[in-house]
Amino acid sequence: MFPAVLAAGVFLTALADSTRGRIACAVYTLTACLLFGVSALYHRGDWGPRAHAVLRRLDHANIFLIIAGTYTPLTILLLPGSHSAPLLWGVWGAAVLGIAFRVFWVGAPRWLYTPCYIAMGWAAVFYLPDFLREGGIAVLVCVVVGGLLYSAGGVVYGIKRPNPSPRWFGFHEVFHSLTLAAFAVHYVGISLVAYQHA
C-alpha cells in the first residue's frame, strides 16, 4: 500500500498549480506515507518488545497526523483566510496534543482515545457549507462519505465488533478496510480540489 500512496501523493502534489497548493498536498502526502509506512512496519514485522512498543506508539500517533494532513489541502485551497487559519491551527494543535497523549499513554483505553479521533475528524462539520460553495457537490460528498467511513472504522475499532472471522478477517481487518476506503474517498475529493484550483 505504501508505494501506491507515495505515487498517488506525488501525482497529487504535481497536480496542484500554486505553491500553496503544492505545499498543502505535500503535507497530506507526507502524513499519508507516515501512516501507511509505519502501519505496514508495525503490523507485518516480527518485532521485539521494545521495537513493538515504539512502533505501536507511532502507529497510533499517526492517526492524528493523517487527520490534520487531510484537512490541510482542503482548508488551504477551499477556505478564505479568515476561516482557514482557525481550522488549521485547531486541527494541528489537536494533532500535537493527541500525539503527545498517545505517545505518553500508549495503554490508554480505547473508549477514551477513539472518540478523540472521531471528534477531531468531524471538526469540518462547521465548514461544510464553505466546502460545498467552493468545491462543489462532488467534493462535499467525498468529504462527508470519507468522514462517515472513518467514523465507522473508529466505532468498529472501539467496540471490537463486528468480528466476523477472528483468525482470518476480524474486527481489526474490518477497521483497516473501512479506513482504506475512507482514505481513497478523501483522496478523490482532494484531487478534485487540486484539479479545480490548478
Place the predicted regions along the sequence by residue.
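Multi-pass alpha-helical transmembrane bundles in non-GPCR membrane proteins
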Residues: 1-198
